[in-house]
């Protein structure tokens, strides 16, 4: 009987873990439209600089303005934002990566919604991405 209890206990634990994974995966898929919306709005060619700056995470905004020695609204106009179609979205916890046909962006979930932590990023293989806009 002890063996049955242990086996049943393992099954219960496995079922709980499997259920938690399904719930967590479901949460990621539910967040995907919000992540995509933030990324594509930031990259839209017609987006005004103020809108782009509002979509930056607070620490990224501060870092970007300090690096550029200018207001975000002035400096963001010089950043090459290639945009394009969404190719993939990866969400892990409160962070995300959106790959567009012309750019890669990184986002974080804040109390105000999904915000950009890095944009205009180029892959460097095994090295970290090289980004024109990035936070600490």
Where are these regions (language model features)?
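Bacterial N-terminal signal peptides that target proteins for export
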Residues: 2-17
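Short, intrinsically disordered, charge-biased short linear motifs at domain edges
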Residues: 12-14, 39-41, 55-63, 108-109, ...
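C-terminal motif of bacterial Sec signal peptides marking the signal peptidase cleavage site
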Residues: 23-26
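Bacterial signal peptide processing site
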Residues: 28-31
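Short solvent-exposed beta->alpha transition segments
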Residues: 36-40, 44, 50-90
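Exposed beta-strand-loop-beta-strand "reactive/processing" segments of non-cytosolic proteins
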Residues: 81-107
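Short beta-strand edge/turn micro-motifs at domain boundaries
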Residues: 104-135
């Amino acid at each position: 009987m002890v063996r049955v209890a242990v086996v049943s206990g393992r099954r219960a634990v496995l079922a709980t873990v499997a259920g938690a994974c399904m719930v967590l995966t479901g949460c990621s898929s539910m967040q995907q439209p919000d992540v995509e919306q933030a990324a594509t709005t930031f990259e839209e060619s017609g987006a005004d600089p103020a809108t782009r700056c509002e979509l930056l995470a607070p620490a990224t905004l501060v870092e970007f303005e300090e690096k550029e020695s200018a207001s975000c609204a002035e400096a963001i106009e010089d950043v090459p934002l290639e945009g394009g179609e969404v190719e993939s979205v990866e969400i892990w916890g409160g962070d995300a990566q959106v790959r567009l046909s012309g750019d890669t962006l990184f986002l974080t979930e804040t109390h105000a919604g999904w915000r950009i932590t890095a944009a205009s990023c180029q892959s460097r293989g095994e090295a970290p991405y090289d980004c024109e806009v990035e936070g600490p």
